[in-house]
Amino acid sequence: MSGPLDRFTSPCFSNNGEKREKKSDFEVSEDEKKTRIGGILKKKSSKSKFRHSLKRRGSRSIDRTLSLTFEDIHDAEELRYVSEFRQSLISDHLLPPNLDDYHIMLRFLFARKFDLGKAKLMWTNMIQWRRDFGTDTILEDFEFPELDEVLRYYPQGYHGVDKEGRPVYIERLGKVDASKLMQVTTLERYLRYHVKEFEKTITVKFPACCIAAKRHIDSSTTILDVQGLGLKNFTKTARDLIIQLQKIDSDNYPETLHRMFIINAGSGFKLLWGTVKSFLDPKTVSKIHVLGNKYQNKLLEMIDASQLPDFFGGTCTCADQGGCMRSDKGPWKDSEILKMGRSGGTFCRHAGAFLSSDSQISSSDKPTYSLKVSDTSTAKSGSELEEMASPKTNTNNHVPKLTPVSEYANGNISPTVLSEYEECVPMVDKVVDVAWQLQEMPNASEGPQYTSSLGKIGSVRHIWSWLTAFFISFFTLLASLALPQTKEHSQLHSSSVRAELCDERIARESRPPSPPRSTITERVIISSVLSRLGDLEKQIENLHSRKSEMPHEKEELLNAAVYRVDALEAELITTKKALHEALIRQEELLGYIDRQKEAKCRRKKFCW
Protein backbone atom coordinates (compact mmCIF):
# COMPACT_ATOMS: atom_id res chain seq x y z
CA MET A 1 0.00 0.00 0.00
CA SER A 2 6.36 5.25 1.40
CA GLY A 3 8.15 7.88 -0.30
CA PRO A 4 9.99 10.43 1.70
CA LEU A 5 10.10 13.63 -0.13
CA ASP A 6 13.60 14.68 0.79
CA ARG A 7 15.18 11.40 -0.34
CA PHE A 8 17.51 13.33 -2.60
CA THR A 9 18.96 15.58 0.09
CA SER A 10 22.38 14.56 1.36
CA PRO A 11 23.48 15.78 4.78
CA CYS A 12 26.71 17.64 5.26
CA PHE A 13 28.82 18.00 8.36
CA SER A 14 30.04 20.98 10.27
CA ASN A 15 33.23 21.04 12.32
CA ASN A 16 33.96 23.00 15.46
CA GLY A 17 34.79 25.97 13.22
CA GLU A 18 32.57 28.63 11.83
CA LYS A 19 28.84 28.72 12.47
CA ARG A 20 26.29 31.11 11.15
CA GLU A 21 22.93 32.17 12.55
CA LYS A 22 19.93 33.42 10.65
CA LYS A 23 17.11 35.47 12.00
CA SER A 24 13.99 33.55 12.90
CA ASP A 25 10.96 33.75 10.62
CA PHE A 26 8.73 33.86 13.66
CA GLU A 27 8.87 35.37 17.13
CA VAL A 28 9.23 33.37 20.30
CA SER A 29 8.52 34.28 23.90
CA GLU A 30 11.18 34.53 26.59
CA ASP A 31 10.13 31.18 28.04
CA GLU A 32 10.32 29.49 24.64
CA LYS A 33 13.60 31.05 23.56
CA LYS A 34 15.64 28.46 21.72
CA THR A 35 19.15 28.20 20.39
CA ARG A 36 19.62 28.44 16.64
CA ILE A 37 22.31 26.23 15.27
CA GLY A 38 23.50 26.35 11.71
CA GLY A 39 26.01 24.50 9.63
CA ILE A 40 27.54 25.11 6.25
CA LEU A 41 29.08 22.83 3.69
CA LYS A 42 32.78 22.10 4.08
CA LYS A 43 35.03 22.26 1.08
CA LYS A 44 36.50 18.96 0.04
CA SER A 45 40.19 18.32 -0.41
CA SER A 46 41.61 19.35 -3.76
CA LYS A 47 42.36 15.70 -4.43
CA SER A 48 38.66 14.85 -4.32
CA LYS A 49 36.19 15.76 -7.01
CA PHE A 50 33.48 18.19 -5.99
CA ARG A 51 30.84 16.81 -8.33
CA HIS A 52 27.76 18.36 -6.82
CA SER A 53 28.36 22.07 -7.23
CA LEU A 54 25.66 24.36 -5.95
CA LYS A 55 26.26 26.82 -8.77
CA ARG A 56 25.72 26.16 -12.45
CA ARG A 57 29.08 26.49 -14.14
CA GLY A 58 29.85 27.48 -17.71
CA SER A 59 26.57 28.94 -18.85
CA ARG A 60 25.56 32.25 -17.29
CA SER A 61 21.88 31.81 -18.09
CA ILE A 62 19.61 32.44 -15.14
CA ASP A 63 16.81 30.10 -14.20
CA ARG A 64 13.81 32.28 -13.45
CA THR A 65 11.70 29.44 -12.04
CA LEU A 66 10.00 30.48 -8.82
CA SER A 67 11.77 28.99 -5.81
CA LEU A 68 9.79 28.11 -2.72
CA THR A 69 11.31 27.45 0.68
CA PHE A 70 9.84 25.38 3.48
CA GLU A 71 11.13 24.24 6.82
CA ASP A 72 11.16 20.67 8.04
CA ILE A 73 11.10 20.54 11.83
CA HIS A 74 12.60 17.36 13.24
CA ASP A 75 11.91 16.04 16.71
CA ALA A 76 15.10 15.96 18.76
CA GLU A 77 14.68 12.38 19.99
CA GLU A 78 13.76 11.14 16.52
CA LEU A 79 16.81 12.96 15.18
CA ARG A 80 19.12 11.16 17.59
CA TYR A 81 17.63 7.78 16.71
CA VAL A 82 17.90 8.43 12.98
CA SER A 83 21.47 9.72 13.33
CA GLU A 84 22.58 6.61 15.19
CA PHE A 85 20.74 4.38 12.72
CA ARG A 86 22.31 6.20 9.78
CA GLN A 87 25.84 5.91 11.14
CA SER A 88 25.28 2.19 11.67
CA LEU A 89 24.15 1.78 8.06
CA ILE A 90 27.09 3.79 6.72
CA SER A 91 29.58 1.71 8.70
CA ASP A 92 28.22 -1.46 7.07
CA HIS A 93 27.91 0.08 3.58
CA LEU A 94 24.13 -0.31 3.60
CA LEU A 95 23.16 3.25 2.69
CA PRO A 96 22.91 3.86 -1.07
CA PRO A 97 22.59 7.52 -2.10
CA ASN A 98 18.97 7.27 -3.23
CA LEU A 99 17.93 6.01 0.22
CA ASP A 100 20.04 8.40 2.31
CA ASP A 101 17.04 10.25 3.66
CA TYR A 102 15.83 11.21 7.11
CA HIS A 103 12.20 10.26 6.57
CA ILE A 104 12.91 6.87 4.96
CA MET A 105 15.06 5.82 7.90
CA LEU A 106 12.53 7.21 10.36
CA ARG A 107 9.76 5.09 8.82
CA PHE A 108 11.85 1.93 9.23
CA LEU A 109 12.52 2.84 12.85
CA PHE A 110 8.81 3.38 13.46
CA ALA A 111 8.06 0.02 11.83
CA ARG A 112 10.31 -1.70 14.39
CA LYS A 113 9.37 0.45 17.38
CA PHE A 114 12.79 2.15 17.39
CA ASP A 115 14.65 -1.13 17.93
CA LEU A 116 17.85 -0.38 16.00
CA GLY A 117 18.78 -4.04 15.58
CA LYS A 118 15.43 -5.05 14.12
CA ALA A 119 15.24 -1.91 11.99
CA LYS A 120 18.69 -2.61 10.57
CA LEU A 121 17.73 -6.20 9.74
CA MET A 122 14.58 -4.94 8.02
CA TRP A 123 16.65 -2.38 6.12
CA THR A 124 19.19 -5.02 5.04
CA ASN A 125 16.45 -7.27 3.72
CA MET A 126 14.96 -4.31 1.84
CA ILE A 127 18.30 -3.47 0.20
CA GLN A 128 18.76 -7.09 -0.89
CA TRP A 129 15.20 -7.21 -2.24
CA ARG A 130 15.76 -4.06 -4.29
CA ARG A 131 18.87 -5.60 -5.83
CA ASP A 132 17.19 -8.91 -6.61
CA PHE A 133 13.97 -7.35 -7.89
CA GLY A 134 15.66 -4.60 -9.89
CA THR A 135 13.63 -1.91 -8.15
CA ASP A 136 16.09 0.93 -8.76
CA THR A 137 15.69 0.66 -12.55
CA ILE A 138 12.14 -0.65 -12.79
CA LEU A 139 10.72 2.71 -13.89
CA GLU A 140 12.87 2.63 -17.02
CA ASP A 141 13.08 -1.11 -17.65
CA PHE A 142 9.55 -2.41 -17.14
CA GLU A 143 6.62 -1.85 -19.50
CA PHE A 144 3.04 -2.96 -18.77
CA PRO A 145 0.99 -2.79 -22.00
CA GLU A 146 -1.86 -4.87 -20.57
CA LEU A 147 -2.79 -2.14 -18.06
CA ASP A 148 -6.21 -1.42 -19.59
CA GLU A 149 -7.25 -5.07 -19.34
CA VAL A 150 -5.87 -5.32 -15.81
CA LEU A 151 -7.87 -2.30 -14.64
CA ARG A 152 -11.01 -3.90 -16.06
CA TYR A 153 -10.65 -6.93 -13.78
CA TYR A 154 -8.95 -5.16 -10.86
CA PRO A 155 -10.24 -1.55 -10.64
CA GLN A 156 -7.71 0.43 -8.62
CA GLY A 157 -5.63 3.58 -8.82
CA TYR A 158 -5.01 7.06 -7.47
CA HIS A 159 -7.55 9.85 -7.81
CA GLY A 160 -7.09 13.30 -6.33
CA VAL A 161 -5.91 14.31 -2.87
CA ASP A 162 -7.55 14.68 0.52
CA LYS A 163 -7.92 17.97 2.36
CA GLU A 164 -4.44 17.60 3.86
CA GLY A 165 -2.85 17.12 0.44
CA ARG A 166 -2.26 13.35 0.61
CA PRO A 167 -2.97 11.29 -2.52
CA VAL A 168 -6.13 9.17 -2.42
CA TYR A 169 -5.79 5.53 -3.47
CA ILE A 170 -8.97 3.62 -4.41
CA GLU A 171 -9.64 -0.11 -4.79
CA ARG A 172 -13.04 -1.55 -5.76
CA LEU A 173 -12.61 -5.04 -4.34
CA GLY A 174 -16.16 -6.09 -5.18
CA LYS A 175 -15.30 -5.90 -8.89
CA VAL A 176 -12.08 -7.91 -8.70
CA ASP A 177 -12.02 -11.06 -10.84
CA ALA A 178 -8.72 -12.78 -10.04
CA SER A 179 -9.25 -15.62 -12.51
CA LYS A 180 -9.72 -13.30 -15.49
CA LEU A 181 -6.94 -11.07 -14.19
CA MET A 182 -4.50 -13.95 -14.42
CA GLN A 183 -5.67 -14.59 -17.99
CA VAL A 184 -4.52 -11.15 -19.19
CA THR A 185 -1.30 -11.02 -17.15
CA THR A 186 0.78 -13.15 -14.80
CA LEU A 187 1.31 -12.94 -11.06
CA GLU A 188 4.97 -12.01 -11.51
CA ARG A 189 4.22 -9.25 -14.02
CA TYR A 190 1.48 -7.80 -11.83
CA LEU A 191 3.83 -7.72 -8.84
CA ARG A 192 6.39 -5.84 -10.94
CA TYR A 193 3.67 -3.42 -12.06
CA HIS A 194 2.70 -2.89 -8.42
CA VAL A 195 6.30 -2.11 -7.44
CA LYS A 196 6.69 0.23 -10.42
CA GLU A 197 3.57 2.16 -9.37
CA PHE A 198 4.86 2.35 -5.80
CA GLU A 199 8.19 3.75 -6.99
CA LYS A 200 6.36 6.23 -9.22
CA THR A 201 4.29 7.29 -6.23
CA ILE A 202 7.44 7.91 -4.20
CA THR A 203 9.40 9.75 -6.88
CA VAL A 204 6.59 11.64 -8.64
CA LYS A 205 3.26 11.67 -6.80
CA PHE A 206 4.46 12.41 -3.27
CA PRO A 207 6.81 15.24 -4.34
CA ALA A 208 4.04 16.78 -6.47
CA CYS A 209 1.61 16.61 -3.54
CA CYS A 210 4.28 18.15 -1.35
CA ILE A 211 4.71 21.09 -3.71
CA ALA A 212 0.95 21.58 -4.06
CA ALA A 213 0.24 21.31 -0.32
CA LYS A 214 3.41 23.15 0.80
CA ARG A 215 4.00 20.52 3.44
CA HIS A 216 5.76 17.19 3.76
CA ILE A 217 3.74 14.30 2.29
CA ASP A 218 4.88 10.66 2.40
CA SER A 219 1.67 8.73 3.09
CA SER A 220 -1.69 8.24 1.42
CA THR A 221 -5.40 7.88 2.16
CA THR A 222 -6.95 4.61 0.98
CA ILE A 223 -10.58 3.82 0.12
CA LEU A 224 -11.60 0.14 -0.15
CA ASP A 225 -15.03 -0.44 -1.69
CA VAL A 226 -16.24 -3.91 -0.66
CA GLN A 227 -19.66 -3.69 -2.32
CA GLY A 228 -20.37 -6.96 -4.12
CA LEU A 229 -17.49 -8.74 -2.42
CA GLY A 230 -18.23 -12.45 -2.44
CA LEU A 231 -16.76 -15.91 -2.61
CA LYS A 232 -15.89 -15.48 -6.28
CA ASN A 233 -13.45 -12.70 -5.37
CA PHE A 234 -11.40 -14.76 -2.93
CA THR A 235 -10.07 -17.73 -4.80
CA LYS A 236 -6.66 -19.22 -4.10
CA THR A 237 -5.22 -17.01 -6.84
CA ALA A 238 -6.62 -13.91 -5.16
CA ARG A 239 -5.26 -15.01 -1.82
CA ASP A 240 -1.75 -15.57 -3.20
CA LEU A 241 -1.85 -12.17 -4.91
CA ILE A 242 -2.98 -10.31 -1.78
CA ILE A 243 -0.42 -12.01 0.46
CA GLN A 244 2.48 -11.25 -1.88
CA LEU A 245 1.40 -7.62 -2.33
CA GLN A 246 1.08 -7.22 1.42
CA LYS A 247 4.53 -8.71 1.99
CA ILE A 248 6.16 -6.36 -0.51
CA ASP A 249 4.43 -3.30 0.96
CA SER A 250 5.03 -4.06 4.64
CA ASP A 251 8.64 -5.26 4.24
CA ASN A 252 9.91 -2.60 1.86
CA TYR A 253 7.56 0.40 2.11
CA PRO A 254 6.56 0.56 5.81
CA GLU A 255 4.43 3.26 7.41
CA THR A 256 2.95 4.62 4.16
CA LEU A 257 -0.74 4.42 5.10
CA HIS A 258 -2.19 7.48 6.81
CA ARG A 259 -5.88 6.55 6.83
CA MET A 260 -8.12 3.82 5.39
CA PHE A 261 -11.88 3.81 4.72
CA ILE A 262 -13.66 0.49 4.12
CA ILE A 263 -17.03 1.43 2.63
CA ASN A 264 -20.23 -0.49 1.76
CA ALA A 265 -19.44 -2.98 4.51
CA GLY A 266 -22.32 -5.31 5.37
CA SER A 267 -23.39 -6.48 8.80
CA GLY A 268 -21.40 -9.70 8.52
CA PHE A 269 -18.31 -7.75 7.56
CA LYS A 270 -18.69 -5.42 10.54
CA LEU A 271 -19.25 -8.36 12.89
CA LEU A 272 -16.04 -10.06 11.84
CA TRP A 273 -14.16 -6.76 11.87
CA GLY A 274 -15.21 -6.26 15.48
CA THR A 275 -13.46 -9.53 16.29
CA VAL A 276 -10.36 -8.92 14.17
CA LYS A 277 -9.65 -5.41 15.46
CA SER A 278 -9.34 -6.70 19.03
CA PHE A 279 -6.01 -8.22 17.96
CA LEU A 280 -4.68 -4.97 16.44
CA ASP A 281 -2.84 -2.10 18.05
CA PRO A 282 -5.21 0.76 19.00
CA LYS A 283 -3.24 3.21 16.85
CA THR A 284 -3.64 0.92 13.86
CA VAL A 285 -7.36 0.51 14.51
CA SER A 286 -7.77 4.28 14.74
CA LYS A 287 -6.56 4.60 11.14
CA ILE A 288 -9.16 2.16 9.76
CA HIS A 289 -12.77 3.29 9.45
CA VAL A 290 -15.32 0.60 8.55
CA LEU A 291 -18.44 2.27 7.12
CA GLY A 292 -21.74 0.99 5.76
CA ASN A 293 -23.55 2.37 2.74
CA LYS A 294 -23.94 5.83 4.33
CA TYR A 295 -20.32 6.78 4.01
CA GLN A 296 -20.58 9.92 1.85
CA ASN A 297 -20.54 12.48 4.67
CA LYS A 298 -17.53 10.85 6.32
CA LEU A 299 -15.56 10.85 3.07
CA LEU A 300 -16.50 14.45 2.35
CA GLU A 301 -15.15 15.45 5.77
CA MET A 302 -11.71 14.27 4.68
CA ILE A 303 -11.82 14.73 0.89
CA ASP A 304 -13.16 17.68 -1.08
CA ALA A 305 -16.10 16.86 -3.37
CA SER A 306 -14.13 17.96 -6.44
CA GLN A 307 -11.47 15.37 -5.61
CA LEU A 308 -13.93 12.53 -4.93
CA PRO A 309 -15.45 10.37 -7.72
CA ASP A 310 -19.16 10.77 -8.29
CA PHE A 311 -19.84 7.12 -7.45
CA PHE A 312 -18.53 7.85 -3.94
CA GLY A 313 -20.64 10.98 -3.45
CA GLY A 314 -18.28 13.52 -5.02
CA THR A 315 -18.66 15.70 -8.09
CA CYS A 316 -15.75 14.47 -10.22
CA THR A 317 -16.50 12.31 -13.28
CA CYS A 318 -13.32 12.61 -15.38
CA ALA A 319 -15.55 11.99 -18.40
CA ASP A 320 -12.89 13.16 -20.84
CA GLN A 321 -10.30 10.72 -19.45
CA GLY A 322 -12.22 7.46 -19.45
CA GLY A 323 -13.62 7.73 -15.94
CA CYS A 324 -12.18 8.44 -12.52
CA MET A 325 -10.50 5.04 -12.11
CA ARG A 326 -8.43 5.57 -15.26
CA SER A 327 -7.72 9.30 -15.05
CA ASP A 328 -4.91 9.22 -12.44
CA LYS A 329 -6.02 12.71 -11.38
CA GLY A 330 -3.78 14.66 -9.04
CA PRO A 331 -1.14 17.40 -8.69
CA TRP A 332 1.33 15.09 -10.43
CA LYS A 333 -0.56 15.76 -13.68
CA ASP A 334 0.14 19.50 -13.42
CA SER A 335 2.96 20.37 -15.82
CA GLU A 336 3.96 23.47 -13.84
CA ILE A 337 4.40 21.47 -10.65
CA LEU A 338 6.39 18.80 -12.46
CA LYS A 339 8.54 21.48 -14.08
CA MET A 340 9.19 23.08 -10.72
CA GLY A 341 10.17 19.72 -9.26
CA ARG A 342 12.49 18.76 -12.11
CA SER A 343 14.24 22.13 -12.17
CA GLY A 344 14.90 22.19 -8.44
CA GLY A 345 12.48 25.07 -8.07
CA THR A 346 11.54 24.17 -4.54
CA PHE A 347 14.02 24.51 -1.74
CA CYS A 348 14.07 22.60 1.49
CA ARG A 349 15.15 24.33 4.66
CA HIS A 350 15.91 21.67 7.25
CA ALA A 351 14.96 22.51 10.79
CA GLY A 352 17.32 20.07 12.41
CA ALA A 353 19.49 17.56 10.58
CA PHE A 354 21.84 14.66 11.15
CA LEU A 355 24.38 14.49 13.93
CA SER A 356 27.94 14.17 12.75
CA SER A 357 30.54 11.98 14.33
CA ASP A 358 31.59 14.78 16.66
CA SER A 359 28.00 15.23 17.88
CA GLN A 360 27.49 18.53 16.06
CA ILE A 361 24.33 19.23 14.15
CA SER A 362 24.68 19.75 10.43
CA SER A 363 22.29 20.86 7.74
CA SER A 364 21.46 20.00 4.16
CA ASP A 365 23.94 20.94 1.49
CA LYS A 366 21.85 21.62 -1.58
CA PRO A 367 18.44 22.46 -2.95
CA THR A 368 16.04 19.69 -3.76
CA TYR A 369 12.61 19.56 -5.27
CA SER A 370 11.25 17.56 -2.38
CA LEU A 371 9.81 19.72 0.35
CA LYS A 372 10.27 19.58 4.09
CA VAL A 373 7.43 21.16 5.90
CA SER A 374 6.68 23.39 8.83
CA ASP A 375 4.05 25.96 9.53
CA THR A 376 6.16 28.73 8.06
CA SER A 377 7.32 29.25 4.49
CA THR A 378 9.19 31.97 2.68
CA ALA A 379 9.87 32.84 -0.94
CA LYS A 380 13.38 33.45 -2.22
CA SER A 381 14.36 36.93 -3.31
CA GLY A 382 15.35 37.70 -6.87
CA SER A 383 19.08 37.43 -6.13
CA GLU A 384 18.59 34.11 -4.41
CA LEU A 385 16.60 32.82 -7.36
CA GLU A 386 19.64 33.39 -9.54
CA GLU A 387 21.82 31.55 -7.06
CA MET A 388 19.47 28.58 -6.81
CA ALA A 389 20.00 27.11 -10.27
CA SER A 390 19.97 23.35 -10.14
CA PRO A 391 23.35 21.50 -10.26
CA LYS A 392 24.75 20.32 -13.55
CA THR A 393 24.68 16.72 -12.58
CA ASN A 394 20.93 16.85 -12.18
CA THR A 395 19.88 18.77 -15.25
CA ASN A 396 19.29 15.68 -17.33
CA ASN A 397 17.49 13.68 -14.71
CA HIS A 398 13.94 13.89 -13.52
CA VAL A 399 15.13 12.77 -10.11
CA PRO A 400 18.14 14.57 -8.62
CA LYS A 401 20.74 12.32 -7.02
CA LEU A 402 22.31 12.53 -3.61
CA THR A 403 25.93 13.22 -2.92
CA PRO A 404 27.63 9.80 -2.76
CA VAL A 405 28.08 8.43 0.72
CA SER A 406 31.82 8.10 0.18
CA GLU A 407 32.17 11.88 0.04
CA TYR A 408 31.07 12.32 3.61
CA ALA A 409 31.75 8.93 5.11
CA ASN A 410 35.49 8.75 4.53
CA GLY A 411 36.28 11.66 6.79
CA ASN A 412 38.44 13.45 4.22
CA ILE A 413 36.42 16.65 4.18
CA SER A 414 38.54 19.74 4.45
CA PRO A 415 37.71 22.20 7.25
CA THR A 416 38.10 25.08 4.81
CA VAL A 417 34.79 26.80 4.11
CA LEU A 418 33.69 27.49 0.55
CA SER A 419 32.91 31.15 0.80
CA GLU A 420 31.56 31.29 -2.72
CA TYR A 421 28.80 28.85 -1.79
CA GLU A 422 27.86 30.33 1.55
CA GLU A 423 24.79 32.07 0.22
CA CYS A 424 23.55 28.90 -1.47
CA VAL A 425 23.88 26.62 1.51
CA PRO A 426 20.71 26.43 3.61
CA MET A 427 21.15 27.18 7.26
CA VAL A 428 19.45 25.23 10.00
CA ASP A 429 16.32 27.14 10.99
CA LYS A 430 15.16 24.74 13.69
CA VAL A 431 14.60 26.22 17.11
CA VAL A 432 16.48 23.75 19.26
CA ASP A 433 16.30 23.42 23.00
CA VAL A 434 19.79 23.47 24.50
CA ALA A 435 18.76 20.94 27.10
CA TRP A 436 17.96 18.19 24.66
CA GLN A 437 21.64 17.46 24.05
CA LEU A 438 22.02 16.62 27.72
CA GLN A 439 19.27 14.04 27.70
CA GLU A 440 20.22 10.39 27.60
CA MET A 441 19.57 8.43 24.47
CA PRO A 442 16.59 6.12 25.11
CA ASN A 443 17.45 2.45 25.11
CA ALA A 444 16.11 0.12 22.47
CA SER A 445 14.02 -1.55 25.13
CA GLU A 446 12.27 1.75 25.73
CA GLY A 447 11.13 1.94 22.13
CA PRO A 448 7.43 1.18 22.79
CA GLN A 449 7.20 3.78 25.53
CA TYR A 450 8.92 6.30 23.33
CA THR A 451 6.69 5.63 20.38
CA SER A 452 3.62 6.00 22.54
CA SER A 453 4.78 9.50 23.42
CA LEU A 454 5.20 10.41 19.77
CA GLY A 455 1.66 9.56 18.78
CA LYS A 456 1.98 10.87 15.23
CA ILE A 457 2.46 7.76 13.11
CA GLY A 458 0.68 4.51 14.06
CA SER A 459 1.94 1.11 13.09
CA VAL A 460 -0.01 -0.12 10.07
CA ARG A 461 2.31 -2.68 8.60
CA HIS A 462 0.02 -5.57 9.68
CA ILE A 463 -3.22 -4.09 8.34
CA TRP A 464 -3.13 -6.04 5.11
CA SER A 465 -2.19 -9.24 6.95
CA TRP A 466 -5.20 -8.94 9.22
CA LEU A 467 -7.54 -7.89 6.43
CA THR A 468 -6.37 -10.80 4.31
CA ALA A 469 -6.97 -13.24 7.16
CA PHE A 470 -10.29 -11.56 7.84
CA PHE A 471 -11.56 -11.77 4.25
CA ILE A 472 -10.35 -15.33 3.72
CA SER A 473 -11.82 -16.60 7.00
CA PHE A 474 -15.18 -15.03 6.17
CA PHE A 475 -15.46 -16.49 2.70
CA THR A 476 -13.93 -19.83 3.66
CA LEU A 477 -16.68 -20.14 6.23
CA LEU A 478 -19.29 -19.39 3.56
CA ALA A 479 -17.75 -21.97 1.24
CA SER A 480 -17.80 -24.60 3.98
CA LEU A 481 -21.44 -23.95 4.75
CA ALA A 482 -22.31 -24.14 1.05
CA LEU A 483 -21.01 -27.71 0.73
CA PRO A 484 -23.26 -30.42 2.22
CA GLN A 485 -20.31 -32.78 2.53
CA THR A 486 -18.52 -30.44 4.94
CA LYS A 487 -21.46 -28.96 6.81
CA GLU A 488 -20.81 -30.84 10.03
CA HIS A 489 -17.09 -30.11 9.91
CA SER A 490 -17.73 -26.42 9.29
CA GLN A 491 -20.11 -26.20 12.23
CA LEU A 492 -17.63 -27.88 14.55
CA HIS A 493 -14.78 -25.67 13.35
CA SER A 494 -16.86 -22.49 13.61
CA SER A 495 -17.92 -23.45 17.13
CA SER A 496 -14.34 -24.10 18.16
CA VAL A 497 -13.16 -20.80 16.65
CA ARG A 498 -15.95 -18.87 18.39
CA ALA A 499 -15.18 -20.63 21.66
CA GLU A 500 -11.47 -19.84 21.39
CA LEU A 501 -12.16 -16.21 20.52
CA CYS A 502 -14.67 -15.91 23.35
CA ASP A 503 -12.26 -17.48 25.88
CA GLU A 504 -9.45 -15.26 24.72
CA ARG A 505 -11.64 -12.16 24.89
CA ILE A 506 -12.83 -13.03 28.41
CA ALA A 507 -9.25 -13.64 29.52
CA ARG A 508 -8.14 -10.38 27.96
CA GLU A 509 -10.93 -8.41 29.64
CA SER A 510 -10.32 -10.03 33.02
CA ARG A 511 -6.62 -9.28 33.19
CA PRO A 512 -5.23 -5.77 33.81
CA PRO A 513 -4.19 -3.64 30.85
CA SER A 514 -0.91 -4.74 29.35
CA PRO A 515 1.47 -3.15 26.88
CA PRO A 516 0.74 -3.57 23.16
CA ARG A 517 1.56 -6.93 21.65
CA SER A 518 5.07 -7.26 20.34
CA THR A 519 5.83 -7.68 16.70
CA ILE A 520 6.83 -11.31 17.26
CA THR A 521 3.52 -12.13 18.96
CA GLU A 522 1.56 -10.52 16.14
CA ARG A 523 3.54 -12.47 13.57
CA VAL A 524 2.89 -15.74 15.42
CA ILE A 525 -0.86 -15.04 15.54
CA ILE A 526 -0.98 -14.12 11.87
CA SER A 527 1.04 -17.19 10.92
CA SER A 528 -1.26 -19.45 12.97
CA VAL A 529 -4.43 -17.97 11.45
CA LEU A 530 -3.12 -18.23 7.91
CA SER A 531 -1.94 -21.80 8.53
CA ARG A 532 -5.37 -22.90 9.73
CA LEU A 533 -7.04 -21.13 6.84
CA GLY A 534 -4.66 -22.86 4.46
CA ASP A 535 -5.62 -26.26 5.89
CA LEU A 536 -9.32 -25.48 5.49
CA GLU A 537 -8.76 -24.32 1.96
CA LYS A 538 -6.91 -27.54 1.10
CA GLN A 539 -9.79 -29.62 2.46
CA ILE A 540 -12.28 -27.64 0.38
CA GLU A 541 -10.11 -28.02 -2.70
CA ASN A 542 -9.90 -31.76 -2.11
CA LEU A 543 -13.68 -31.96 -1.95
CA HIS A 544 -13.98 -29.95 -5.14
CA SER A 545 -11.33 -32.03 -6.88
CA ARG A 546 -13.06 -35.35 -6.22
CA LYS A 547 -14.45 -37.01 -9.33
CA SER A 548 -18.16 -36.60 -9.83
CA GLU A 549 -18.37 -40.03 -11.54
CA MET A 550 -19.04 -43.05 -9.35
CA PRO A 551 -16.53 -45.95 -9.36
CA HIS A 552 -17.49 -48.86 -11.61
CA GLU A 553 -17.96 -51.34 -8.76
CA LYS A 554 -20.20 -49.02 -6.81
CA GLU A 555 -22.09 -48.20 -9.97
CA GLU A 556 -22.76 -51.91 -10.57
CA LEU A 557 -23.98 -52.34 -7.01
CA LEU A 558 -26.21 -49.33 -7.40
CA ASN A 559 -27.59 -50.64 -10.70
CA ALA A 560 -28.26 -54.06 -9.13
CA ALA A 561 -30.07 -52.36 -6.28
CA VAL A 562 -32.12 -50.36 -8.77
CA TYR A 563 -33.00 -53.53 -10.69
CA ARG A 564 -33.98 -55.26 -7.45
CA VAL A 565 -36.18 -52.32 -6.52
CA ASP A 566 -37.82 -52.47 -9.95
CA ALA A 567 -38.49 -56.22 -9.51
CA LEU A 568 -39.94 -55.66 -6.07
CA GLU A 569 -42.14 -52.91 -7.45
CA ALA A 570 -43.40 -55.31 -10.18
CA GLU A 571 -44.09 -58.03 -7.62
CA LEU A 572 -45.87 -55.53 -5.44
CA ILE A 573 -48.07 -54.50 -8.35
CA THR A 574 -48.88 -58.17 -9.09
CA THR A 575 -49.66 -58.80 -5.44
CA LYS A 576 -51.92 -55.76 -5.31
CA LYS A 577 -53.75 -57.00 -8.39
CA ALA A 578 -54.22 -60.49 -6.92
CA LEU A 579 -55.41 -59.03 -3.66
CA HIS A 580 -57.88 -56.85 -5.50
CA GLU A 581 -59.23 -59.87 -7.39
CA ALA A 582 -59.49 -61.83 -4.14
CA LEU A 583 -61.47 -59.03 -2.56
CA ILE A 584 -63.86 -59.00 -5.53
CA ARG A 585 -64.25 -62.77 -5.29
CA GLN A 586 -64.93 -62.43 -1.58
CA GLU A 587 -67.64 -59.86 -2.22
CA GLU A 588 -69.27 -62.17 -4.73
CA LEU A 589 -69.22 -65.08 -2.27
CA LEU A 590 -70.70 -62.98 0.48
CA GLY A 591 -73.46 -61.85 -1.89
CA TYR A 592 -74.18 -65.45 -2.88
CA ILE A 593 -74.43 -66.52 0.79
CA ASP A 594 -76.83 -63.71 1.55
CA ARG A 595 -79.06 -64.72 -1.37
CA GLN A 596 -79.12 -68.34 -0.23
CA LYS A 597 -80.17 -67.31 3.26
CA GLU A 598 -83.02 -65.22 1.94
CA ALA A 599 -84.24 -68.08 -0.32
CA LYS A 600 -84.22 -70.47 2.61
CA CYS A 601 -86.27 -68.09 4.73
CA ARG A 602 -88.86 -67.74 1.96
CA ARG A 603 -89.25 -71.53 1.65
CA LYS A 604 -89.92 -71.90 5.39
CA LYS A 605 -92.65 -69.28 5.31
CA PHE A 606 -94.28 -70.98 2.33
CA CYS A 607 -94.43 -74.27 4.21
CA TRP A 608 -96.35 -72.72 7.08
From Swiss-Prot:
Residues 17-33 have a biased composition (Basic and acidic residues). GO terms for biological process: protein transport. CDD domains: SEC14. Residues 526-572 form a coiled coil. The keyword NAD does not apply. Its main location: Golgi. Residues 146-320 form the CRAL-TRIO domain. One of its GO terms (cellular component) is plasma membrane. Keywords: Cell membrane, Coiled coil, Golgi apparatus, Membrane, Protein transport, Transport. It is a peripheral membrane protein. It is found in: Golgi apparatus membrane; Cell membrane. InterPro entries: CRAL-TRIO_dom, CRAL-TRIO_dom_sf, CRAL/TRIO_N_dom, CRAL/TRIO_N_dom_sf, PI/PC_transfer. Required for transport of secretory proteins from the Golgi complex. Catalyzes the transfer of phosphatidylinositol and phosphatidylcholine between membranes in vitro. This is Phosphatidylinositol/phosphatidylcholine transfer protein SFH4. The gene is SFH4.
